């Protein structure tokens, strides 16, 4: 109780002592001048206002920066959206173009499929309307004039073609037999029977003297054999090598292409009868053949022609005592060109061309031709021209059986070839040859119906043939009839690699040689211009110099 009272008294005393009225604080100072206080407060207020303005400016700048950044982001987003839209549009356009190209390619593949043999030449609508082509306003003689010209000039000039063929074939048989007798079966080439090709064997020869073209296939002696390599078997081939191929000479013990031991791994208990374990195959070894190019296993065309000319010379010297005429090389720039020269002064030319068969087909690799279809020069001496002459003869023979009796297709070709040869003698040779005429005719035969080739339609078909040539010249495009042409009936037996190859343009040299192209076009229209007068002149009178003068000969 006493302790509690003491605590209360202590609190009261403490409160009295600490009351400010009784004991004021010693450190408390009252400002003497209120104006100084007000001035300081105003200065402080101004500082606060300045700071507030600075903060407001800073906030405004930050807001402007944010706005600019926002606008930049929006601009970038807009540009990105536009780029995406343009990229999407471009991708869409590219996709549409690709689809369009695929559709065109599929259509082209279907469009080029070969018709059945019984429908040969029934697609008349696939050709453009060539009969309305102007030919620069030049006109051809009517059918009556053409018929009279054909009977007087062409049929009469080629009446002895059969006798010429018979005589040349008999002599060549004897010559090749003598050649075989001089060759050794163990070391020399094996020469096979000749094959007649071109105009004399397709019945459209028109120029005199009548000229026989004969292929002479040959094979190497054992143990060698030929391995042909087509240009279309390679993915990338230069344009100047299209239509050519190479012929590799291989030994039987080096050729593993047809042997299973070169493709599979034999077990230890299996032995190849052709290639023993001790018989190591040396790929790419140098072929021991004098007809190959230096340091190459491929046949050289120049060496083959030199060998062939030497062999023919030896064979002729062996049998020359049996004949009362001389044999000479006709043209120095055309290997294989021969000429029989009688004592009366008359002569009979013919071509013997060494060839190599391409596998088991009717394609032949030709060393040289007097008139190369491509119109160009070969890239190297190991390039052999691929000839379709046997297929062309077979196609004309098969097609002729489906045409009406007395069809005018060969007459058209003969008249056109006659006009071209006369024009070449007037203005010199051009880039247009008889092979181009025949190629154009083959295309028309495949496109026209058989009924369109009746004899009374000679003038219409001749006009169409010349219009087709005109169109091809203007476009600088004349496709090879067999290479890449899927319209050709499969019954022809054309190799599938050639059938599916890229089409070969026979007029490709015109793209690179402008002067040759201009000369060819001018010569073509000059030929059309001279055709009426030339046909009329030869219909009334056949000049004695129907043939050109014989070139210089070299006696064997």
UniProtKB/Swiss-Prot annotation:
Glycan-bearing residues: 27, 84
Transmembrane region(s): 89-107
Keyword Methyltransferase: no
Family matches, as InterPro entries: ITPRIP-like, Mab-21_HhH/H2TH-like, MAB21L/cGLR
Signal sequence interval, chain numbering: 1-15
Alphabetical list of Gene3D superfamilies matching this protein: 1.10.1410.40, 3.30.460.90
Residues exposed to the Extracellular side: 16-88
Side Cytoplasmic, residues: 108-556
Chief localization: membrane
Membrane topology (UniProt): Single-pass type I membrane protein
Annotated GO CC locations: membrane; nuclear outer membrane; plasma membrane
Positions in coiled-coil regions: 32-87
GO MF entry, a single one: protein kinase inhibitor activity
Annotated keywords: Cell membrane, Coiled coil, Glycoprotein, Membrane, Nucleus, Signal, Transmembrane, Transmembrane helix
GO terms under biological process: extrinsic apoptotic signaling pathway via death domain receptors; negative regulation of extrinsic apoptotic signaling pathway via death domain receptors
Location in or out of the cell: Cell membrane; Nucleus outer membrane
UniProt function note: Enhances Ca(2+)-mediated inhibition of inositol 1,4,5-triphosphate receptor (ITPR) Ca(2+) release.
Subunit annotation: Interacts with ITPR.
The protein's name: Inositol 1,4,5-trisphosphate receptor-interacting protein
């Amino acid at each position: 109780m006493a302790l509690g009272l003491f605590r209360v008294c202590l609190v009261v005393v403490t409160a009295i002592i600490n009351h400010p009225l009784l004991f004021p604080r010693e450190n408390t100072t009252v400002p003497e001048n209120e104006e100084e206080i007000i001035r300081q407060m105003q200065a402080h207020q101004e500082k606060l206002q300045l700071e507030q303005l600075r903060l407001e400016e800073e906030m405004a700048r930050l807001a402007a920066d944010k706005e600019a950044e926002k606008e930049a982001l929006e601009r970038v987003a807009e540009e990105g959206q536009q780029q995406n839209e343009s990229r999407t549009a471009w991708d869409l356009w590219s996709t549409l173009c690709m689809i369009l190209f695929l559709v065109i390619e599929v259509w082209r593949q279907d469009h080029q499929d070969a018709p059945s043999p019984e429908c040969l030449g029934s697609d008349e609508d696939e050709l453009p309307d060539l009969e309305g082509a102007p030919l620069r306003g030049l006109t051809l003689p009517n059918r009556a004039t053409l018929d009279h010209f054909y009977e007087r000039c062409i049929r009469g000039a080629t009446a002895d073609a059969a006798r010429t063929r018979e005589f040349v074939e008999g002599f060549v048989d004897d010559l090749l037999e003598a050649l075989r007798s001089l060759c050794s079966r163990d070391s020399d080439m094996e020469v096979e029977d000749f094959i007649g090709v071109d105009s004399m064997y397709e019945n459209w020869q028109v120029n005199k003297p009548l000229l026989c073209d004969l292929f002479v296939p040959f094979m190497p002696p054992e143990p060698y054999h030929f391995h042909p390599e087509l240009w279309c078997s390679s993915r990338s081939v230069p344009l100047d090598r299209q239509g050519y191929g190479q012929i590799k000479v291989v030994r039987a013990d080096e050729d593993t292409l047809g042997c299973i031991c070169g493709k599979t791994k034999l077990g230890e208990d299996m032995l190849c009868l052709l290639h023993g374990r001790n018989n190591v195959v040396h790929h790419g070894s140098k072929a021991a053949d004098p007809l190959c190019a230096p340091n190459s296993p491929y046949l050289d065309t120049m060496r083959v022609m030199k060998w062939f000319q030497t062999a023919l010379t030896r064979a002729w010297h062996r049998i020359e005592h049996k004949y009362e005429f001389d044999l000479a090389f006709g043209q120095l720039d055309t290997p294989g060109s021969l000429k029989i020269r009688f004592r009366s002064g008359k002569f009979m030319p013919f071509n013997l061309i060494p060839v190599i068969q391409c596998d088991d087909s009717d394609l032949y690799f030709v060393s040289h031709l007097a008139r190369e279809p491509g119109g160009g020069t070969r890239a190297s001496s190991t390039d052999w021209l691929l000839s379709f002459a046997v297929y062309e003869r077979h196609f004309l023979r098969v097609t002729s059986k489906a045409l009406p009796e007395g069809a005018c297709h060969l007459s058209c070709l003969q008249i056109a070839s006659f006009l071209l040869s006369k024009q070449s003698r007037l203005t010199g040779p051009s880039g247009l040859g008889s092979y181009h005429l025949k190629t154009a005719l083959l295309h028309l035969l495949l496109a026209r119906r058989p009924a369109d080739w009746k004899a009374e339609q000679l003038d219409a078909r001749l006009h169409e043939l010349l219009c087709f040539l005109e169109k091809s010249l203007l476009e600088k495009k004349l496709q090879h009839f067999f290479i890449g042409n899927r319209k050709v009936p499969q019954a022809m037996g054309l190799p599938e690699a050639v059938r599916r190859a890229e089409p070969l343009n026979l007029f490709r040299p015109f793209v690179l040689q402008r002067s040759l192209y201009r000369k060819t076009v001018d010569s073509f229209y000059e030929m059309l211009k001279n055709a009426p007068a030339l046909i009329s002149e030869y219909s009334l009178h056949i000049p004695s110099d129907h043939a050109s003068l014989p070139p210089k000969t070299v006696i064997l």
